[in-house]
């Protein structure tokens, strides 16, 4: 590749990155795809990764899967290899191909040098797939594995899902204990903490503890910075007051 072509690829790549980081996904995608015309470019695999990720963000799971599978065959380093696998798993999950999630995750488990955070992403996808396939026992085991591996966002979500399972099974004390633990151990993940307090309020309502439910919701409304969580809390609070 001559220097002029290399410079053009470099300029295009960083222009695409600028659009990507500014959330101008359509413009970024057009430029990344131009960079895919040259497999010899050092920006080829990076652009594949971005295109696949953009389609995933746009919920175009079939196209995202296509590009992650291309990345799987053209990765330049271990990070891209692992990201291709997690991307493939994510798309299989959203496409409701739960058996494929289990099959692919068994392949990933054989790869070395996977960070705890990435292992937790994989564990969470497996757990959610088990739930969708109505294998609750396997799902609970995998959720607990996720929670115990490392205190990251996947573990926070796993804690919330586990509490939901306990609640639907009528194990309200276990559900509350799980949610209190979530709020204590994962307090930096505001979305999951907010959802946790919403579920705590619902559990209190189901126990006819309306005073505690109201106090929980009022505290959440006063403290959350997430408007969607605040709106949901207000709706539940209004329902209590209308009774």
What are these regions (language model features)?
Residues 1-243:
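Acidic, polar-rich low-complexity tracts and alpha-helical solenoid repeat scaffolds
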């Amino acid at each position: 590749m001559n220097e002029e072509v290399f410079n053009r690829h470099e300029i295009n790549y960083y222009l695409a990155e600028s659009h990507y980081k500014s959330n101008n996904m359509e413009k970024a995608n057009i430029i990344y795809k131009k960079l895919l015309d040259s497999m010899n470019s050092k920006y080829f695999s990076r652009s594949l990764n971005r295109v696949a990720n953009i389609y995933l963000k746009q919920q175009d799971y079939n196209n995202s899967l296509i590009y992650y599978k291309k990345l799987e065959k053209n990765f330049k380093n271990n990070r891209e290899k692992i990201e291709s696998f997690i991307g493939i798993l994510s798309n299989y999950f959203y496409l409701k191909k739960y058996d494929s999630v289990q099959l692919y995750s068994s392949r990933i488990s054989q790869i070395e040098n996977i960070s705890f955070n990435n292992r937790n992403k994989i564990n969470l996808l497996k757990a959610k797939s088990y739930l969708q396939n109505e294998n609750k026992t396997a799902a609970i085991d995998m959720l607990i594995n996720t929670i115990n591996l490392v205190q990251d966002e996947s573990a926070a979500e796993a804690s919330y899902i586990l509490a939901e399972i306990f609640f639907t099974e009528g194990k309200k004390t276990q559900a509350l204990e799980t949610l209190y633990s979530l709020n204590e151990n994962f307090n930096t993940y505001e979305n999951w903490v907010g959802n946790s307090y919403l579920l705590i309020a619902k559990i209190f309502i189901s126990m006819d503890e309306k005073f505690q439910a109201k106090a929980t919701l009022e505290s959440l409304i006063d403290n959350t910075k997430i408007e969607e969580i605040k709106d949901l809390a207000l709706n539940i609070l209004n329902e209590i007051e209308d009774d």
